[in-house]
Amino acid sequence: MSSTKPPTTTNKRKRTSNAHDEAPAKRVPEASSSKVTLDDSQPAPATSSDAVLGARSAPGTDYERVPFSTLNLSPPTTAAIERMGFETMTEVQARTIPPLLAGKDVLGAARTGSGKTMAFLIPSVELLSTLRFKPVNGTGVIIISPTRELALQIFGVAKELMQGHSQTFGVLMGGANRKAEADKLVKGVNLIVATPGRLLDHLQNTKGFVFKNLKALVIDEADRILEIGFEEEMKQIIKLLPSENRQSMLFSATQTTKVTDLARISLRPGPLYINVDETKEASTADMLEQGYVVCESDQRFMLLFTFLKKNLKKKVIVFFSSCNSVKYHAELLNYIDVPVLDLHGKQKQQKRTNTFFEFINAPAGILLCTDVAARGLDIPKVDWIIQFDPPDDPRDYIHRVGRTARAGKSGKSLLFLLPSELGFLRFLKVAKVPLNEYQFPQKKVADVQKQLESLISKNHYLNTSARDGYRSYLQAYASYSLKKIFDVNKLDLAKVGKAFGFAVPPKVNISVGSVKAKKSRDEDESSDDDGQPKKAYYRNRGRK
């Protein structure tokens, strides 16, 4: 194979929908778990997840949809909702919007894909409209989001919702032109969507930024904001913002001690607590079919390659544990004619934005990403979620699979596990996540190992990228908090090396820092590890 530089990761191939993908076929379940074989010749049984969960009520039987027309919203907002194609409210919207319109503070808990973006945007827009905010009044609503992509998405919905209103709106986020943002703030932006770091920067340093008239603060994905290291920034932001006559809304998929602490300092005493999931028997969407596959390290890439080749006409998201691993696999797959897009925290903001919207608008395609895409993003018609590298926590699993089966639609997910990682299933069971075991017939897995090793040995650019990906995979693995399940010392490095295309695994240095390393490995907007890393040197070793 050629040793020329691999092409830039793009996805220009036009695709159409195909009903035949690599779907699980029915097998007789074992006593301890439900197993199905992944075979493209037979479709998945519609009730496969029910074998684990037992009988379930159909979506919508527990909650009767309420029309938006019952809210008595302003004509511009009503018209915008109609243009967006919405007629009735989701459960979180029906339970949240009325008290917010009445001026109450709300602490909301809802699974991803529940419609909470509209739940806080509609009251925010109505508040600005009722108070007749103008640019000279400065900022009346601030919405804080953990990631740039989610901020852009919220901004896009706000733009549609405010189309018939006179109020101004804008987005502040790291990676964007700070001076251009500051110029707009001085002119007056009534509704702001922002990431924490950039918002704090403007609050502290932008002269002429008027926020003394702030009437509403929205903190979205609060648990994620805190997880990626913005706890101190959030405390500073809340101290700087006026609290008198300010309505606050805090939304979090999980209720942790830190989220409770943040709610205490940001919300007024006695907020209304709304949890639409507490009576649900599963933590994930009703229409989501979930499975896992057990395979050794040296089989992982070949299994992924086989799956993606058979699902080129589907919309698929594949999650990895590190930026370098995403980069390597994207370069490799594009080089061998499996077109993919890639999204991770080391990319420049313009590249991330372009990739994000290209995948959203594509009828089919494959997106390789880190957890930068796991929270809150509403990507239409995703067929499969593949967790090639398992998450460190059931909450992360839930947010990853939340990219599919949204708003009552169906979807599928597949989790890759090593035999040594099966203990993670116990944690998922406690978190009310129903899973089937899937099995790939070995004869249908493409044996491309020799070709892969030949390519990596001859192509300098791919070899360097593979080495970086291999090192980062070990680095991420060593930072997992569930050490008894994800133990880097139990990895067979010879087999791990083969998955990255090495006949003999390279010698690499990895740094294992403080507990923050787990969250900084995605390098989205969180700061680098500020602990003193200890070195671990991994030589060529493998279990016999």
UniProtKB/Swiss-Prot annotation:
Can you tell which superkingdom this protein's organism belongs to?
Eukaryota
Q: Where is the composition biased (Low complexity)?
A: 1-10
* InterPro entries in the cross-refs: DDX18/Has1_DEADc, DEAD/DEAH_box_helicase_dom, Helicase_ATP-bd, Helicase_C-like, P-loop_NTPase, RNA-helicase_DEAD-box_CS, RNA_helicase_DEAD_Q_motif, SPB4-like_CTE
Feature: compositional bias, Basic and acidic residues: 18-29
Q: Which GO terms describe its cellular component?
A: nucleolus
Cite the record's Polar residues compositional bias ranges. Answer: 31-50
Motif Bipartite nuclear localization signal per UniProt: ranges: 299-315
Residues forming the motif Q motif are 66-94
Q: What is known of its domains?
A: The Q motif is unique to and characteristic of the DEAD box family of RNA helicases and controls ATP binding and hydrolysis.
Query: What is this protein's record name?
Result: ATP-dependent RNA helicase HAS1
Q: Which species is this record about? A: Cryptococcus neoformans var. neoformans serotype D (strain JEC21 / ATCC MYA-565)
